[in-house]
Amino acid sequence: MASEPRWVSVEAVVALNREEAEKTGEPHQLIDRAALDIAVRRPWNVWVYFMDRDFATLATALLVAIAGAKAFAAGNERTAYRAAVGLLEANEITVDLGGNRERAEERLFEYFHGRLSQAGVADWFKTWMAEAGRG
């Protein structure tokens, strides 16, 4: 069995939301701590109960759960994206968008508007993921 990944903490997600809110002048306010706690644990549940070791799937689970939790007053989608990337980076996987950053992120964010499925999100991560040092 593969060693357990490094998980993203609730505190790290709160800090990411604070940064995102500051960038846009939106309020940083955690309005549902319980929902955020559950969302942050979602990839662990996928790892343990579904025995899914695919990091694109784990990142997708985190992104979908945090965005869906709507635990913050603002910036939930941007925070979800950064947390998912943070999960990958904590496990020595980079998301290397190169010169395609704006277009690639626009495509991913179509999930939040119902124009990209969860499978599409996982495929997006698989397309742009690279193990650190091998990108």
Model segments located where?
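FIC/Doc superfamily catalytic core
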Residues: 1-135
